[in-house]
Curated annotation (Swiss-Prot):
Coiled coil: none annotated. One of its GO terms (biological process) is regulation of pH. Na(+)/H(+) antiporter that extrudes sodium in exchange for external protons. Belongs to the NhaA Na(+)/H(+) (TC 2.A.33) antiporter family. It is a multi-pass membrane protein. Its main location: membrane. It is found in: Cell inner membrane. GO terms for cellular component: plasma membrane. It comes from Shewanella denitrificans (strain OS217 / ATCC BAA-1090 / DSM 15013). This is Na(+)/H(+) antiporter NhaA 1. InterPro entries: Na/H_antiporter_dom_sf (IPR023171), NhaA (IPR004670).
Length: 450
């Protein structure tokens, strides 16, 4: 009788612990939705500040020089550069962790899902780039062809929550997978096409350090401090190489261990035995007053950590700082453009503006939905349950929200072209708002007809 009671209590303890473990996709969606709210708030502040009587103080703040010196060595950069070249590396590191998880255990782990997502994402990148290039062919502004390729995952999922009751949950997972592949494409574009002069020595040093991390992962090294120190050195070498340092963030993330040190079956056995031992020794379950129980609880914690993966732990640890701090700071430093009727008119008349607006709205729509139709027609891939081509058309409009990544690419491509950069940022905002509204209206219309 007592044994049955202990077994029941043990199961209850384990059940309560397991109830705290949520599905990775659910956690990802919730984090991205929260991120969209903070991003929106920071964007509104930046726009208000840049268009108010305090606009001069805004420009002074983002161009404030910060740094330190030791003897003759001096490291100094503007606040905007610190955010774009430093803090955003952490965002891209988190992005790399998410990409690795999706490839190993997420939507991209299954071949049939992977084929459809890759085909749709390729269409959603190539078509906008071609449309932009058509408007800017042989012009200096042609360098901005990568701007309309990107999708802002946080804003896209945030917008989708407005119609979440009217769309299949599998559509949200589809867009998450689509955005992940899209991010991979954007990262490759940044690494290959938005790199100026390359220092081969520094680039080889960065590659060697990242390769060393990969070997360490294979050898079973799991200490966070080790990966942090070598990772910072790789970031510095990448920064000096001429390749944008955010590329280092992604590649370092791919070396982070994704396998647990302790199999889940063994961890459950050990946890059960420890809980049973605690129950057998004493009825006093007070951890504070009972040193033995305290030590046993620490053992359970140690086993639990060994049963989880460094990749998931670090992803969870970075999620909140990126959502609450890094992405809003990026929006605050980069979204402050002067907007008025004349700036919107200039955007729709300028080749850069025409290329970005057409690329994000029409390019994403034609590219993603067209690629999906092609894949279905020739049986190359399949859609998730309850998702049809009409849903994909709505999703392709939502994918035209390119705020964060598009703005980031615009700052790389037009860093020394003030007019083009201003038009690009204004056009990204305008196109993102328009395509979000169109996507919401279309998905709502489709749901009423279903």
């Amino acid at each position: 009788m007592q044994s049955n009671k202990m077994t029941k209590e043990t199961k209850n303890v384990l059940q309560r612990g397991l109830e705290n473990i949520h599905h990775p996709v659910s956690n990802f969606i919730r984090a991205q939705t929260t991120s969209s709210l903070f991003l929106l708030f920071a964007t509104i502040i930046a726009l208000w500040w840049a268009n108010s009587d305090y606009a001069q103080s805004y420009q002074a703040l983002i161009h404030t020089q910060l740094g330190f010196f030791i003897g003759d060595f001096e490291l100094k950069a503007s606040l905007k550069h610190i955010i774009n070249d430093g803090l955003m590396v952490i965002f891209f590191f988190l992005l790399g962790l998410e990409i690795k998880r999706e490839v190993i255990a997420g939507e991209l782990a299954q071949a049939k899902n992977r084929r459809m997502l890759i085909i749709c994402a390729m269409g959603g990148m190539v078509c906008p780039a071609l449309i932009y290039s058509g408007f800017n062919w042989s012009l200096d502004s042609q360098i901005g062809w990568g701007i309309p390729m990107a999708t802002d995952t946080a804003f896209a999922l945030g917008v989708l929550t407005m119609v979440r009751k009217h769309i299949p949950s599998s559509l949200v997972a589809f867009i998450v997978g689509l955005a992940i592949v899209d991010d991979v494409g954007a990262i490759l574009v940044i690494a290959i096409f938005y790199t100026q002069e390359i220092s081969l020595m520094h680039l080889l040093s960065a590659c060697a350090l990242i390769g060393f991390l990969g070997v360490a992962n294979y050898a079973g090294v799991r200490q966070p401090l080790f990966y942090f120190i070598i990772g910072v050195a790789a970031w510095w070498a990448m920064l000096k190489s001429g390749v944008h340092p955010t590329v280092a963030g992604v590649t370092i993330a791919l070396t982070i261990p994704a396998q647990p040190k302790l199999a889940s079956g063994k961890w459950l056995e050990k946890a059960k035995s420890i809980i049973s031992a605690i129950q057998n020794k004493s009825k006093n379950m007070d951890v504070l007053g009972n040193k033995g129980h305290h030590e046993q609880v620490l053992k359970v914690r140690d086993f639990a950590e060994r049963a989880s993966t460094p990749l998931r732990r670090w992803e969870d640890a970075l999620d909140l700082p990126v959502v609450l701090f890094i992405l809003p700071l990026f929006a605050l430093a980069n979204a402050g453009v002067v907007i008025n009727l004349s700036s919107f008119i200039e955007s729709v008349q300028h080749p850069v503006g025409l290329g970005i607006i057409s690329g994000l709205i029409l390019g994403k729509l034609i590219g993603i939905s067209g690629a999906c139709w092609f894949a279905l027609k020739f049986n190359i891939g399949c859609l998730p349950d309850k998702v049809d081509l009409n849903h994909v058309i709505g999703a392709s409009l939502i994918a035209g929200i390119g705020f964060t990544m598009s703005t980031f690419i615009a700052t790389l491509g037009f860093g020394d072209q003030d007019t083009a950069l201003h038009v690009a940022k204004t056009s990204i905002l305008l196109a993102s708002v328009l395509t979000a509204i169109l996507g919401l209206l279309y998905l709502r219309f489709v749901s009423t007809k279903a």
